Structures are given as C-alpha cells and as structure tokens.
Amino acid sequence: MSRRLRILVAVGLMVIGATVVWRHYRYARPVGEGPAGPAVPHEAFASTWSDRNVVLLGLGDSVTQGLGASPGRMYFRRLVTNPPDEFANMQGICLSRVLPHLEPLNLAISGTTSIECVDYQLPKLTPYDAETFGVVVITTGGNDVIHNYGRTPPREGAMFGARTNEIGEWVENFDRRLDTIADRVRETFPGGCHIFIANIYDPTDGDGDIQHAGLPSWPEGLQVLAAYNEVLARFAKRQPDVTLIDMRAEFHGHGIHCTHFWHREYRQNDPHYWYWDNLEDPNDRGYDAIRRLFLIEMARILPAKL
C-alpha cells in the first residue's frame, strides 16, 4: 500500500469516527437506569399525617394519566403506593403510608388541553362531605402549547407555531381557566383541599430547537412556553391553597441535549433522557422524578393542613 493510500485510508477512518461521535452526541438519548430526581426525606414519612378521609384527585393530561409509563410506574400510582421492586431510597415513602384512609381518583385523560379539562373533567366532580380533605395533582397546559404539532394553523388550545403577538388572549383565557379549576376543586372539597400543579417542561433543554426532535422549527416556541409557565407561576403565587411543582427546572438537562457535555444544562451525575418515545411524556425515570417533586412538597405542606 502506497504512502498516499495509507494517508487517505487514515483520513477516511478519522472522518468516519468523527461522524459516529457526532451522531452519538447529536442523536443519542440513553435513558439510564435506577432512581431519578431529588431525594425525598424519609423522616417526613415515618409517622401518620392524619386519620382523616383523604382523596387524591388527579386532573389534566397524559402526564397525570401516566402515558409512557410501564405498569405501576406512573407518578400518580407511585404517589399512592410503592411498586413491588421499589428503589431502596424510596421504600415506605408514599401517601398510603402516612394517610391510612386515602382514596385515589384519577380523572386525567391523555391529550387533554386546559380547555377540555374544564369542559369534560370538572363536570365529573361531585362534592365530598366536610370530613374529607382533597389532595389534588394537576398537569395541564402542555397540550395547549404543543398541539397540533404544526399540522394546522395556530389557535387557542393548539398553539404550535404561534408568534408571541398572537397569543395574548389565549394566555389570558388560560389564566382564567386555572381559576375556574381551583374554584371547582374547592366546591368539591368543602372540608378543605390543597392543589399541587406542575409547570410545563421543555424537551429542548432551553434551546428551543424542536426541529431536532422531529417537529417543525418554531422560532418563538420558547417565548410561548414561557408565557404559559408564567401564568402557572402567578396562579400558584396568588392562591394560598396552590403549590407550584417546578417540573420544568428538574427536567432541564434530561431532554434532547442530555448527552451534550458542553451544554449549559448538562447533568453530569445523570446525563440521561427522561422523556418517552413521543417526546411529550416522561419515561419511567421521568415519572420517578415527578413523583419525588410532588412528595417533597406534599410532605412540607400537608401535615400542618390535615
């Protein structure tokens, strides 16, 4: 083999190797294994919080319904009870351990927008007696933003592709719908309640390059998402019986840039993808992280309210 040919072969192998490495860091989305998310303090679940009748009510979209989770791994179910093969650091950390008279009721439906939550889920609620306390978990608004994936012109409830100068009325209506949801929940639980509502995560890890996840480019997508998350934050701030679960911050670094060690959101301790195949919903590890976020806030708030 001539010297020139050896050089060409070496260069070719280097190009192939560089291409393989580039494709890995651009497209690889390893999910990892084991626990995910923050630690939950064991001591908060060491004794009973209350002997009252308590209903755990789920409202909203596919995240609360559990789409993308393996059987028994959705966050709502994991709030209630631990799966048989629970991680060692989560054994005994669940609501049924501290609320012996807990009744779970999950009305969340995959694909539901905040409009449909008001129109179809709230009418299913019937008041409980004054002895019953409501613990309400909600994920809503994400489908308002991502539907209809660029297949139709942007509209309220399906804003994908919208510009920020188009969404003012839609954002105001979302704000009003959240108040409607809270009012209806309070009517359902005259004995008291507390609402835990999550904000909306961003699978682009703050870059807004949704086109790298297989959807059309959306130049103002981050601004639209931020407008909805600002509404959720204001809603929780003005309502004394509402707590915001910061799902967005926890999921940053676990989206489509999870393997990019140079990215500002890179999570060195867990550089893995927490989303399911459809991009919209969590995988099992993502649901683990979500239940931990809810449990931490519940342990902080509920013992004093029950």
Each language-model region and where it sits:
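N-terminal secretory targeting modules
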Residues: 1-59, 63-84, 96-98, 131, ...
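Alpha-helical cap/lid subdomain in secreted, periplasmic
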Residues: 2-6, 122-279, 284, 288, ...
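Residue-level signal for beta-strand positions within conserved beta-sheet cores that form or flank
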Residues: 52, 100-103, 191, 240
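Short beta-strand segments
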Residues: 60, 108, 138-140
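Residue-level signal for short, function-critical loop segments
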Residues: 62, 110, 199-201
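N-terminal carbohydrate-binding/catalytic regions of secreted carbohydrate-active enzymes
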Residues: 65-128
